[in-house]
Amino acid sequence: MKGKLYTKKGDGGKTSLFSGRRAEKFDPRVAAVGDLDELSASIGLARVAYPPSNDLLRSIQRALYVISAIVSAEQRAIDVKFDATEVEALEIEIDRVTAALPELREFIFPGEAEPSCRLHLARAVARRAERGIAGLAEPAPPEAVLAYLNRLSDLLFVLARQADQSGGSTESCLRT
């Protein structure tokens, strides 16, 4: 017989971190892990809506699980590698996608087509996850984690623009 999904250990408003520490569900570290989970789900929706980015977004979801483990582990040693090479991989993708896009001279509004809207939503969730992790007290996550989330929101922005362009949508711009 399989075990039950629920344990009832969280019914009192606490949960367990990967470090083993019991924490209030409103603890900033628990909230940060929740934001990363929401980001991964948002990226999953974007993958479904914009198949050309499926493999790239799937690899990002994997990276987000590693980041979640790092954040949840606190000071506990875990056998994961997350460094500047992860950030550099995103930068390469940002540059590749940007090179094929028209120059952006105005602010754009999300909402022209579903694929770009889902990518923009994931971008906004990435920004929130970045803010939550940036606010964590000791132990702070590795610098590469914050840099990765910062680049990720940039990548999601250019992918949203690419989705609009490849789908034949015209970007809705704010005239300044």
Pin down the residues of each PLM region.
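Phosphate/pyrophosphate-binding loop motifs in nucleotide- or prenyl diphosphate-using proteins
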Residues: 1-176
